[in-house]
Amino acid sequence: MMLQHPGQVSASEVSATAIVPCLSPPGSLVFEDFANLTPFVKEELRFAIQNKHLCHRMSSALESVTVNNRPLEMSVTKSEAAPEEDERKRRRRERNKIAAAKCRNKKKEKTECLQKESEKLESVNAELKAQIEELKNEKQHLIYMLNLHRPTCIVRAQNGRTPEDERNLFIQQIKEGTLQS
């Protein structure tokens, strides 16, 4: 009966020590132990070693074939589909480029329009502020002229108002003017 050796085997020992009769303690097998084995056991060990090496080579060869075939299949598929896909990508890029240019132009036009509107509103605002200042100056001038005219006004004297009343009215108008400004 062939049993697997339960202990660890070093690299210096024969790699087939895993399949030997378990007659010795683990790790105690050396090359001399194999010299006394019968030819049948030697042949069986040789076959096990070759089988193990063959299995290892086949699995690594299978992995390399599997790994190498996949990209090869994909590259064949890619090369067949590449012109169509490249054309699709090129058209998509071209459409994207046109859309991006259109978007930039719209944005530029909108910015220019807003800039013009802003400048126009600033101009109108400046004109209105100038007009307000002009109207304030005109008001002050008219109040001054009115106050110069009041003491000599015949119409007011006929109404029964005295110069004192006129002076109080003038002070009241000045106060209202400063409150409104």
From Swiss-Prot:
The modification Phosphothreonine is found at T162. Keywords: DNA-binding, Isopeptide bond, Nucleus, Phosphoprotein, Repressor, Transcription, Transcription regulation, Ubl conjugation. The keyword DNA-binding applies. Residues 114-142 are annotated as: Leucine-zipper. Residues 88-110 are annotated as: Basic motif. There is a cross-link at K78, K175 (Glycyl lysine isopeptide (Lys-Gly) (interchain with G-Cter in SUMO2)). One of its GO terms (molecular function) is DNA-binding transcription repressor activity, RNA polymerase II-specific. InterPro entries: AP-1, bZIP, bZIP_sf. Residues 73-97 are annotated as: Disordered. Induction: By stress. Residues 86-149 form the bZIP domain. PROSITE patterns: BZIP, BZIP_BASIC. GO terms for cellular component: centrosome; CHOP-ATF3 complex; ciliary basal body; Golgi apparatus; nuclear body; nucleolus; nucleoplasm; nucleus. It is found in: Nucleus. It holds the Pfam family bZIP_1. GO terms for biological process: cellular response to amino acid starvation; endoplasmic reticulum unfolded protein response; gluconeogenesis; negative regulation of DNA-templated transcription; negative regulation of ERK1 and ERK2 cascade; negative regulation of transcription by RNA polymerase II; positive regulation of cell population proliferation; positive regulation of gene expression. CDD domains: bZIP_ATF3. This protein binds the cAMP response element (CRE) (consensus: 5'-GTGACGT[AC][AG]-3'), a sequence present in many viral and cellular promoters. Represses transcription from promoters with ATF sites. It may repress transcription by stabilizing the binding of inhibitory cofactors at the promoter. Belongs to the bZIP family. ATF subfamily. Binds DNA as a homodimer or a heterodimer. Interacts with KAT5; promoting KAT5 autoacetylation and KAT5 deubiquitination by USP7. PANTHER family: CYCLIC AMP-DEPENDENT TRANSCRIPTION FACTOR ATF-3 (PTHR23351:SF23), FOS TRANSCRIPTION FACTOR-RELATED (PTHR23351). This is Cyclic AMP-dependent transcription factor ATF-3. It comes from Mus musculus.
